[in-house]
C-alpha cells in the first residue's frame, strides 16, 4: 500500500474514491460542504432521503460524473459534539472496509471535519496515523494455510488531503508511523494465528533474524538449551523439559541512541503451545493455546516497528520461547527447581509455566542495567475475567511508568487498566 498526502484543491483531486464526513445532525461542514456544492448539492438529497444518517460505521458510496474523482464516499461519524479519535478510527475503518470490497484502486480522505475535537495537540499527525493504521487493521487476513474464501484487495493508494502547508510534515510523519505500526500489528496477528507446528521457537528465531538483519544498529543473539543450562536457567528449562522441540532465548539488541543512554528492555512470553504440561488443560478449546506466545509476537512486532522507523533509542528485546507439553521427561507437580537468580521454586501446577520462563528471562535482562523493563505476557485468563476484553491489565512498581503507559493507551485507543501490585500480595507471589 502506498500512503501519501494530497495538496490539490477538491476539483483537481484525481482518485477513484473521495471520502468526506457526515454527522448525524445532517449538517455538512468544511470539506464535505465544498464537495456537496461542487456536485449540485447531491449529498443533501441523500441526507434528506435518509440514505445516510451519519451513524458511526455507516458508509455510502455514490457514483459521480464529470469529475476528476469517480465516487464520493459518505463516512458516518456520529454526533459532531462527541467526535473523538476513537470515533474517527471506527468511522475510517468502516469506510476503508467498504471500499476494499470494491475494485477501486485509490482513495483520498477528506474526513477532517470535527478534528478540532480530537484531544491531542497534534491533530494532523493523529488523523493520518489512524488512517494508515486502520487500513492495516481491516486488510489483515491469514493466508499461510488458508487458500479459499480470501478477499481480493484492489486498493493500492491511500492519500490524505490538505490545503495547509504547515500540516504537511505532520501528516507525512503520521502516515509513516501509522504504516510501520500497522505492519507490525499485522505481524503480531500473523504469528499468533500460525499453528504451533509452524510457529515453533525456532521459527520465531527466523522471524527475529530477518527483522534485525535489515538494520545496521541491530544485533541478534540466540541462546540454546545448553547455553541456558550453563547460565542456570533451570526455571525456564523445567517448562521445556517435556518437549522435543528445542527452547530458544531470543535476545535482540538495538543501539541507535547515545552510548550513555540506558536501554529499554522488553520481555515477551513465548509459549508457542501450552497444553498445561502434566497439569493438563481441558481439551475443549485447547487449540487456542497457540496464542500463548502473543507476548512474544507483540515483542517481535515492536522490534520490527522500532527498527523500521530507526528510532533514536537503545532497546533490548528478550523472548523466552518454548513449548509446555507432557511426556516422560516433563516436570512433575511438586518438583523443585532453582532459577537463574538462585531462588528455589516448588512447581505445584505445571500450567503456571509463564512465570517460570519469565523469571529467568527477567533475571537475564537485568544484566543490561535497563532504564526500565516492560514484560508482556498472556499470563492468566483471570485478567480477562477481571477486566473483560477491552482493557489490558497493567501492573507496575513505578507510578510514573504506569501513568505513562496508561496515557499511551489512551492516546492510541489501546487502553490499559492498572491492577494492584503491593506488598500485600508478596506472600501469594
Which residues does each PLM region occupy?
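Short amphipathic alpha-helical segment within the helicase RecA-like ATPase core
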Residues: 1-270
Amino acid at each position: 500500500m502506498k500512503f501519501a498526502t494530497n495538496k490539490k484543491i477538491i476539483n483537481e483531486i484525481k482518485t477513484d474514491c473521495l471520502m468526506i464526513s457526515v454527522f448525524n445532525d445532517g449538517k455538512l461542514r468544511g470539506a464535505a460542504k465544498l464537495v456537496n456544492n461542487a456536485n449540485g448539492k447531491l449529498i443533501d438529497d441523500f441526507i434528506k432521503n435518509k440514505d445516510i444518517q451519519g451513524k458511526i460505521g455507516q458508509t455510502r458510496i455514490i457514483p459521480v460524473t464529470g469529475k476528476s474523482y469517480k465516487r464520493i464516499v459518505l463516512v458516518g461519524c456520529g454526533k459532531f459534539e462527541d467526535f473523538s479519535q476513537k470515533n474517527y478510527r471506527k468511522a475510517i475503518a468502516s469506510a476503508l472496509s467498504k471500499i476494499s470490497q470494491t475494485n477501486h484502486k485509490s482513495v483520498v480522505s477528506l474526513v477532517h471535519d470535527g478534528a478540532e475535537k480530537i484531544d491531542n495537540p497534534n491533530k494532523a499527525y493523529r488523523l493520518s496515523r489512524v488512517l494508515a493504521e486502520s487500513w492495516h487493521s481491516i486488510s489483515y487476513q491469514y493466508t499461510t494455510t488458508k487458500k479459499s474464501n480470501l478477499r481480493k484487495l484492489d486498493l493500492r493508494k491511500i492519500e490524505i488531503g490538505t490545503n495547509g502547508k504547515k500540516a504537511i510534515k505532520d501528516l507525512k510523519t503520521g502516515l509513516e508511523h501509522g504504516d510501520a505500526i500497522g505492519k507490525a500489528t499485522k505481524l503480531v496477528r500473523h504469528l499468533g494465528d500460525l499453528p504451533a507446528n509452524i510457529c515453533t521457537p525456532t521459527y520465531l528465531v527466523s522471524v527475529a533474524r530477518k527483522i534485525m538483519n535489515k538494520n545496521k544498529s541491530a544485533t541478534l543473539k540466540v541462546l540454546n538449551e545448553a547455553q541456558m543450562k550453563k547460565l542456570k536457567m533451570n526455571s525456564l528449562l523445567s517448562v521445556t523439559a517435556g518437549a522435543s522441540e528445542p527452547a530458544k532465548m531470543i535476545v535482540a539488541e538495538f543501539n541507535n541512541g547515545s552510548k550513555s543512554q540506558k536501554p529499554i528492555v522488553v520481555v515477551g512470553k513465548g509459549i508457542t503451545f501450552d497444553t498445561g504440561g502434566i497439569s493438563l488443560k481441558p481439551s475443549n478449546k485447547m487449540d487456542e493455546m497457540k496464542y500463548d506466545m502473543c507476548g512474544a509476537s507483540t515483542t517481535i512486532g515492536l522490534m520490527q516497528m522500532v527498527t523500521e522507523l530507526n528510532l533514536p533509542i537503545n532497546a533490548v528485546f528478550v523472548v523466552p520461547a518454548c513449548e509446555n507439553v507432557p511426556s516422560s521427561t516433563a516436570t512433575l507437580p511438586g518438583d523443585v527447581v532453582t532459577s537463574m537468580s538462585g531462588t528455589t521454586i516448588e512447581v505445584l501446577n505445571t500450567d503456571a509455566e509463564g512465570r517460570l520462563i519469565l523469571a529467568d528471562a527477567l533475571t537475564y535482562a537485568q544484566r543490561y542495567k535497563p532504564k526500565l523493563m516492560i514484560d508482556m505476557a498472556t499470563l492468566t485468563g483471570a485478567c480477562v475475567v477481571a477486566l473483560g476484553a477491552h482493557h489490558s491489565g497493567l501492573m507496575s512498581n513505578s507510578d510514573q511508568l504506569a501513568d505513562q503507559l496508561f496515557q499511551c493507551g489512551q492516546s492510541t485507543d489501546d487502553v490499559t487498566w492498572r491492577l494492584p501490585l503491593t506488598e500485600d500480595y508478596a506472600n501469594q507471589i
